[in-house]
Amino acid sequence: METIALGVEPRVIRKKEAAKLRKNGIVPAVIYHKGEETVAVSVNEIALNKLVHSAESHIIDLQFPDGKTLRSFIKDVQFDPVSDRIIHTDFQLFAADEVVEMEVPVAISGDSIGVEKGGKILILRHALTIQGLPANMPDHVTIDVTNLDMGHIIHVREIPMDAYTGLSIMDEPETPVISIAPPKKDAEAETESAAG
């Protein structure tokens, strides 16, 4: 997993401060670690957007103006429901030997049988919650869809984790992750015959 540097500035929590920051392209954030006091910071919205909307997960070195660096990952991101802009982020610190839970993006490999028949791949979960040591965390979890046919679904319990040493998926086993939807014409015909 790649490590990315991200500049942060300490901030004082005051009334209306967050709205003022956001207006200037700055996102309020907090840094926390078990048993330690939460630290309020701010981060550049453009730099944060690149990380949040990346197809891979990252370890993040939070760099303060005084030269101090803290190793972390993004634990939570809040979006504005109207504009979809990031309005707040939580960074979690960790030790190298500490088991953590991270959101890791899903990637697809293979040419699906269902797609060759005209179906469409639907990614129902774009990220999975993975538990393990930070050093073992992958950039993404790759799911082979070669044998996935029309109407079939891959659930969390069906994702092989053999290639990912010491890692576990923490999402519910029955959670659907990927499916193949029939072509639009077929789906409309099924709806009409069910209604008829």
From Swiss-Prot:
Region (Disordered): 177-196
GO MF term list: 5S rRNA binding; structural constituent of ribosome
UniProt entry tagged with the keyword ATP-binding: no
Pfam families according to UniProt: Ribosomal_L25p, Ribosomal_TL5_C
SUPFAM superfamilies: Ribosomal protein L25-like (SSF50715)
GO biological process entries: translation
Keyword annotations of the record: Ribonucleoprotein, Ribosomal protein, RNA-binding, rRNA-binding
GO cellular component: cytosolic large ribosomal subunit
Source species, domain of life: Bacteria
Entry-linked HAMAP family: Ribosomal_bL25_CTC (MF_01334)
Function: This is one of the proteins that binds to the 5S RNA in the ribosome where it forms part of the central protuberance.
Quaternary structure, from the entry: Part of the 50S ribosomal subunit; part of the 5S rRNA/L5/L18/L25 subcomplex. Contacts the 5S rRNA. Binds to the 5S rRNA independently of L5 and L18.
Family, as annotated: Belongs to the bacterial ribosomal protein bL25 family. CTC subfamily.
Protein name according to UniProt: Large ribosomal subunit protein bL25
Species in which this protein is naturally found: Chlorobium limicola (strain DSM 245 / NBRC 103803 / 6330)
